[in-house]
Amino acid sequence: MRVVIALGGNALLKRGEPMTAEVQRQNIKIAAEAIAPIAAEHQIVVTHGNGPQVGLLALQGSAYKPEEAYPLDILGAETEGMIGYMLEQELGNVLPFEVPLATILTMVEVDGNDPGFQNPTKFVGPVYDASEAGELHQQKGWVFKQDGNKWRRVVASPIPRRIFELRPIQWLLDKGAVVICAGGGGIPTMYERGKERTLIGVEAVIDKDLCSALLARDIEADLLILATDAEAVFTGWGTPERKAIFKTNPRRLGEFSFPAGSMGPKVEAACHFVNATGRVAAIGALADIPAMVRAERGTIISSSFSDITWHVEVPIPGPASRPV
């Protein structure tokens, strides 16, 4: 079976943790241990978030003069190399030596007329209090939006249209490699207006879940797993009536609304993939990845399900909850 596993930002850096290399390495080690059992039996592609990392590099780059600072597309490429290296190393420490690993810098085409450029929504970088965010807005012109009780920088997040490195990814998979690619949604690029053969970088960050769904569709994956810090997709989140969805179809899932900055993009990406391919998507906790492959944990989304079944209790990492 061919599986795309999209690691949420929590797989690399949990909220409130310092953005140090050692902290990220420890989190990536946990992710590698969850992925390894799947890689031993299936063809695996791993994608990952990079919001905190690309934001940190942008903050470091602010020491440059504005005209000398590196743009977001280059910072995104840097994070793909950095995180890909750490994932390769930790996966290599738990997989058999003969399993090849490869990280691919992945350029992704976007449309210069995408409405996302007019309404920045993608969180990048660390959290700030209101006064710090205000100062940075005045100094650098950055746009901020509230994220919980803090503030974070937001940038444009255009829809991914095409993955340029698709063929090399497929070649490596066919040779048995575990492929790490499309980190942070890939490097946003487009053809320069009036120059059909000139590819240029774009100051934006692509949603990694939507890019993972596009990748999974194009490589004909059997399963798309979106790993996050929640054990399943919940209705009534934050209320006493919250319930965890076990199995459902895209139509029924579309009847609910989910937060735009967290679960919303994952649900949208999962439904896109299922509707486009007729295959299966799963959303759940990082530790539950092996159980999601077996359709025992998380929220499993398939057009073959006629309605919704619920986890009897809030699922926690471990044996699957019994469905209603």
UniProtKB/Swiss-Prot annotation:
Keyword Repressor: no
Highest taxon of the lineage: Bacteria
Record's catalysed reaction(s): hydrogencarbonate + NH4(+) + ATP = carbamoyl phosphate + ADP + H2O + H(+)
Biological process according to GO: arginine deiminase pathway
This protein's UniProt keywords: Arginine metabolism, ATP-binding, Cytoplasm, Kinase, Nucleotide-binding, Plasmid, Transferase
Enzyme Commission numbers on file: 2.7.2.2
GO molecular function, one term: carbamate kinase activity
Cellular component, GO annotation: cytosol
Pfam families per record: AA_kinase
InterPro entries: AceGlu_kinase-like_sf, Asp/Glu/Uridylate_kinase, Carb_kinase
Subcellular location: Cytoplasm
Pathway(s) annotated for this protein in UniProt: Amino-acid degradation; L-arginine degradation via ADI pathway
Family: Belongs to the carbamate kinase family.
Name of this protein: Carbamate kinase
Organism: Rhizobium meliloti (strain 1021) (Ensifer meliloti)
Gene that encodes it: arcC
